[in-house]
Regions:
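Nucleotide-sugar donor-binding catalytic core of glycosyltransferases
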Residues: 6, 13-283, 297-309
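Boundary detector for helix-to-coil junctions that initiate low-complexity/charged tails
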Residues: 1-7
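Catalytic binding pocket for nucleotide-activated donors in carbohydrate/polymer assembly enzymes
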Residues: 264-376
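Generic surface-pattern signal
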Residues: 10, 15, 59, 109, ...
Length: 377
């Protein structure tokens, strides 16, 4: 597994820094899958599992993977003009409907026979491009969706279920929005792994559980507040609750630190509070899990994701969205170290086993099927 991680990091350096694109091989029997991608860490996290398992795909299903930055595709500067069986593409979340359609048509003109998948890496659960893309794609891939698919037909204040909740909670004036799902779209909607399956987290999950009996920090919660009005008020409320604990608990909540120091703090923390961001699923959720810090987070039971890492009372501690039970649960789990470690260990081992057993290779089969890339057993 370590070799696959280093291959990914070398790939990132070659594509991002050197601007070199590796052509597909000339082996006629191999199928070809091309990822057209945006340049952002969250975007790259969505495709990492595929490139991590690239050799498995070649061996088990006989197809190759290549990555083409979206900017290079738009400029027609790439070596992928030949036949391609599947194209998976990303865009930024604020692309206009007309621009998205133009891009989709360009992909179709370039590879007329390819099956197309859209990779929605966006933080919120909404499916804003479903209706636009439905006639053109074989699959719509996202790292989290609402468990109740019927909720997608409900109008929201703002763009998402989170903007809706916090606009109502804080009395904010946001326009009503509805991203209706086309009939039958649910069959195209597929899940991809969340942030746990990334090159900077995976190595930690492959190590033994980081048990530490004498963690010195009671609560870790470095919370950024600046952002859009609903986000700022939501995060400020969370920060204020954490700051109230400073007089009686040892808390890390103020300012920014580098990644190494940040992880060092988490390895030394009993509890980690991870409020929502612009979406529910956050990097911090899994950083808490691989450091053995017990995750406290607003209730995630409304979401689907895989691996299914948010199991109430088993892999994390759910909080009310208004955080009315925050102080009570902080006090309880600080006073019950055995229960705290049990839940933290469960979370770590659930993800560790997912990676060790290479379950992604099974979970991805519905997507491969839709793209015509699966080799029949």
């Amino acid at each position: 597994m370590k070799t696959a991680i280093w291959r990914w990091r070398l790939h990132r350096a070659v594509v991002d820094r050197l601007g070199l694109l590796r052509p597909f091989s000339q082996r006629g029997a191999r199928k070809r899958c091309l990822f057209i991608t945006e340049r952002d860490a969250i975007c790259q996290a969505q495709i990492f599992p595929f490139f991590f398992h690239a050799r498995d795909f070649a061996r088990q299903h006989g197809f190759e993977l290549r990555e083409l930055p979206l900017s290079r595709f738009l400029e027609d500067r790439h070596p992928y003009g030949g036949a391609v069986e599947a194209v998976c593409f990303q865009t930024w979340f604020d692309l206009s409907p007309d621009a998205l359609l133009e891009l989709t048509h360009k992909i179709r003109r370039t590879w007329p026979e390819a099956k197309i998948a859209y990779f929605d890496w966006f933080a919120p659960t909404d499916l804003r491009y479903a209706a636009i893309l439905d006639p053109h794609i074989a699959a719509y891939v996202k790292k989290q969706t609402l468990r109740d698919i019927g909720q997608y037909d409900r109008p929201t204040l703002g763009d998402t279920n989170l903007t809706d909740y916090y606009a109502r909670r804080f009395g904010l004036d946001l326009p009503e929005t509805r991203f209706a799902l086309p009939a039958g779209f649910e069959g195209k909607l597929l899940l991809s792994p969340h942030f746990a399956f990334t090159d900077h987290m995976l190595p930690y999950f492959l190590k033994p559980f980081p048990r530490r009996e004498n963690r010195s920090l009671d609560l870790h919660a470095r919370i950024a507040v600046k952002g859009t009005p609903w986000y700022s008020q939501m995060r400020q409320e969370a920060f204020d609750l954490v700051a109230k604990q400073e007089g009686r608990l040892k808390v890390a909540c103020r300012g920014r630190v580098g990644r190494d120091e940040y992880f060092k703090e988490l390895f030394d923390s009993k509890l980690c509070f991870s409020p929502f961001g612009y979406g529910e699923v956050c990097w911090r959720d899994f950083e808490a899990m691989f450091t053995g810090s017990l995750l406290l987070k607003p209730d995630m039971s409304h979401l689907n994701g895989y691996p299914e890492a948010f199991i109430p009372g088993e892999t994390y501690v759910p909080l009310a969205w208004d955080l009315s039970d925050f102080e009570e649960k902080v006090a309880y789990y600080l006073a019950h170290p055995d229960e705290r470690e049990r839940i933290a260990r469960n979370a770590f081992e659930l993800l560790q086993q997912y990676f060790q057993h290479r379950r992604f290779l099974e979970d991805v089969l519905p997507l491969l099927r839709r793209l015509g890339l699966e080799t029949a057993p």
